[in-house]
C-alpha cells in the first residue's frame, strides 16, 4: 500500500512540473501579446504548448478518476463541463483564450497553488518591468489616449486600462502569497503604487478595486493583531459567492438601466460609462447562451 502511495505521489509530482512548464509557455504568450514589445513569440511554439496542455488535461482527468482524487463524484464531471462549455464558447466567438484558460484551470488540479502563483508573479514582474523600461526610454511606443480627465499612458502595454489591470493582479497575487506575513508598510506601498498607476493611466475601475483591496487587507491585518481570525466565522463563508453576486448585479444593472434616472447616471459615471455602453450592446445584440460575434466600426469582438 505504501509503495502504491509513493508511486502516486511521484506521478503527481512530475505531473505538476509538466503543468508548470506549460503554464510558463502559455502565460508568456498572452502576457507578451498584451505589450507593445516587438518580440515575436513563435506561433508554432504556442500551438505546440496548447496541444500539449490538452493532452496533459486529458491524462490529468484520467488520473483523478483512476486514483479517486476528488472530494465528490461531481468534481470530475464539473471539470469536463468546464472544458465543454469553454470549447463551445471558443467555437462560437473564436476567442481561443477562453478555452486556454479553461485548460489551465482544470489542469491545475493537484498542483500547489503557491507554485502557480510564484511562477505567474515572476513572469508578470519581469515582462511588466521590461515593457515599462522600454516605453519610458523610447525603445517602444508609449501608447497614449486623450481623455476628459487628461492624457492616459499605457507604459508599454497595449491599453491604459490593461496596464492598470496587470499591476492590480500582480499586487493581488503578491498579497495572497504573503498571507499573514504581509506588513502595513507593504499594504501602504501597494496603495501608493495604485495611486501612481491611476495618475498615469486614469483607469478608474482598477484604481477603485486596488483601493478596496488595500482597505480589506488593512482590516484583516488589524483584526489579526487583535487575535480575531475571520476564518472562524462561518457567516463570512458567504463571501465566497460575492463574485457571483457581482456578476448577477451587473447583469441586472444593465438590464434595468434607465438613462433618465439620476442614480443610474451617477453609477454609470463612476464606472466610466460601462453600464450605458453595456445597455446599448444589450439592446442591439442581445445575449446568447454561448456568446456571439459583434461587429462595430469594422472591429470584430467575441
Where are these regions (language model features)?
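Hydrophobic transmembrane helix bundles of membrane-integrated enzymes that assemble
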Residues: 7-31, 47-262, 283
